[in-house]
Amino acid sequence: MELWYTEEQTQHVRLSFKVKEHLFSEQSEFQKVDVLDTYEFGKLMTLDGLVMVTEKDEFIYHDMIVHVPMAVNPNIKNVLIIGGGDGGTARELMRYQSIKHVDMVEIDKMVCDVARDYFPTISSELENPRVSLYYEDGVAFIKDKENKYDLIIIDSTDPVGPGEGLFSQEFYTNCFKALTEQGILVNQNESPVYEQFAREAIRANSKLKKIFPIVEVYQAQIPTYPSGYWLFGFASKSLHPVKDLKSSVWNQLNLNTKYYNTQLHVGAFALPSYVKEQIENGNV
C-alpha cells in the first residue's frame, strides 16, 4: 500500500508527496508538528499541515533570505531572526565570521527540538555560541529594542496562527526602531500566483512602504511552496538592494552557496510585469 501526504495549498490546488515513513507527529502549545520521510524531497516538516521545510529544497529559501541582505552590507554585525525554528537561517548567517551575534526568537520550542532531532544538517548552528535562542513571541521581544540590529530577518510562518502578529504595521514600526542607521529588514512575502497569498504580499509591502524609505521585492523558485514561485521583501533605512550591492566584497568571501550568487541577486529584483502591477496598484 502506498502512503501519500497531500498539502492543500488553496481550495482548488494540492501538492502530494509519496511517503516512506511518518516519523513524528505531536501537538505543541501553538501548532501541530509533523515530520515525514518522502521519496523525492527527503525529510520534510509540516506545521498545521503546511510544509515548512524539506531537505531537498531548503537551501533555496535560506540562501535568499540571508545572502541577499548580507551582500548589500557585508559589515553586518548584529542580527535578529524572528521565527526560523528549523535553524537554516542561523546556519547561513554563521558562515559570516564578521557577524558578532544573532538573537533568534522562536515562539515554539518544539519546532527547534524537532529540527535538532530530524534535520541535523539544517539545525547545525543552533548551539553556536554566537547564537542566543529565545522561546518567546517575536512581537513582544522587539518592542523595547532601539538601534540594536544591523539586520532583522522575519523568517515566519504565514500570516495566520502564531505568525499573524508578524505582519502588522505596529510590528514593522518596532522593527524600524530596532534597526541601526544602515539597517535592513528582510521577510518572506508569500506568492503572487494564488489570490489569497498575493493579497498578503501586497499588504505586507504596502505596510513596509509607510515606514521604510527603501522597499523592494525579490523572488525565488521554491518547488514545495505554494505555486513554486515565492517573494521576499527587502526594506532598509538607507541601502538599496541593487544599487548598493557589494558584489566584489561578497564574492571574495568564497562562501560556495548552492543557490545564491551576485548575478542572481540582481535578477531576483527584476520582477515579472504582473507582479510589479500587483505591488504598485495593490490589486490582485
Curated annotation (Swiss-Prot):
Annotated GO MF terms: spermidine synthase activity
Residue positions binding S-methyl-5'-thioadenosine: 31, 106, 137-138, 162
PROSITE patterns listed in its UniProt record: PABS_1 (PS01330), PABS_2 (PS51006)
GO biological process: spermidine biosynthetic process
Subunit structure: Homodimer or homotetramer.
Active-site residues, as the UniProt record annotates them: 155 (proton acceptor)
Annotated binding of spermidine, by residue: 62, 86, 155-158
Catalytic activity: S-adenosyl 3-(methylsulfanyl)propylamine + putrescine = S-methyl-5'-thioadenosine + spermidine + H(+)
Pathway: Amine and polyamine biosynthesis; spermidine biosynthesis; spermidine from putrescine: step 1/1
Organism the protein comes from: Alkaliphilus metalliredigens (strain QYMF)
Annotated ranges, domain PABS: 2-237
Cellular component aspect of the GO annotation: cytosol
Any Pfam family matching the protein: Spermine_synt_N
InterPro entries assigned: PABS, PABS_CS, SAM-dependent_MTases_sf, Spermi_synthase, Spermidine_synt_N, Spermidine_synt_N_sf
Similarity section: Belongs to the spermidine/spermine synthase family.
Protein name as catalogued: Polyamine aminopropyltransferase
E.C. designation(s): 2.5.1.16
NCBIfam families, alphabetized: MFS_SpdSyn (NF037959), PRK00811.1 (NF002010), speE (TIGR00417)
Primary role: Catalyzes the irreversible transfer of a propylamine group from the amino donor S-adenosylmethioninamine (decarboxy-AdoMet) to putrescine (1,4-diaminobutane) to yield spermidine.
Keywords assigned: Cytoplasm, Polyamine biosynthesis, Spermidine biosynthesis, Transferase
Subcellular location: Cytoplasm
